[in-house]
Amino acid sequence: MAISLCSALVLVTLSQAPPPPVAPTDSLATLRGRTARDSSDAQLWLLMGRAYLGLGVEAHGATHRSSEDSVWTRAVLDTAEEALGRAAALAGPLGSSAVGDSARVFRVGAWAARSWLGWEAGGVKAGVEAWGPLPMDLRVPPVLDELGENLLRACPAGGVLLTAGDADFYAAWYMRFARGLRPDLLVLPLAAWRSDAVLRARLMADLKLGRRTGDDAWLAELVRRRPVCVSMAFERPPETRPRIRWETRPLVWVAGPEGKSPRVPPRDFVFGALRLALDGSDPWAEPALAAYTRAARATPPLCDAMATFKVAADVPTCRK
């Protein structure tokens, strides 16, 4: 049975939307037709879910859809979430297939994009009650559980964690909202702040930042008000003018007032799920390993913790 949208109007609008970020031969119309013929193909549902998720995220980009189109965006994200949930169910239990695990990860992405709608309407303090509730079966692979927990643990109290890509954002967002860790932190992709003018304006108002021009001028003011952590999924922290003095910590770069937040020692970070993911050829191990490799290069004592979990040999900096 093919997936249904919220209304005929939304279906017409989607048919006129720009091409989604899937393979050129796999347009939304093609994918809908293929799932109508074979509704048991998890890979097809994953492709369609990612296509709709791409449309939903694009609605938050530089060409942000107007507030009148929030129903359109929510319908797209609802459709993405439903397709990705179906892909995960068809592909089997968590950890049994790459297709199923990827569907679960991108399903978290659909909920994260929903949270932006909630923030735009109700402010940054709008929690799960404003755009949830989250489904009980929302999960990510253990290697991303671990990455998210490590990143949240690394940030000072009351901070803003800026993430680089899908893996570190979905991991940190999931642990923050689905698992309830570190409710004092705001988790946000740097790309979303830069590209989504509506979200940025709302966050700047809620965080009491002045009106700033320039690429990252807002960041200097944010650093004066709150601790800011930058995930080491980035190659380096953002370069701004005036320059921000970033301090290197395990897994993150940090700037801003930290108060009495204790620094987390390198030995307190865990990498057991990474070891299992590497042994199982989990594709989500790759972005986690890349972030950890960069972190070990910046903070060599992390190698001792990595050795405890038998992953040091997989990190070039830690090889002896």
Locate each region found by the language model.
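Phosphate- and divalent-cation-binding pockets in alpha/beta enzyme and binding domains
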Residues: 170-172
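Short His-Asn-centered micro-motif
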Residues: 162-166, 190
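Bacterial N-terminal signal peptides
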Residues: 2-13
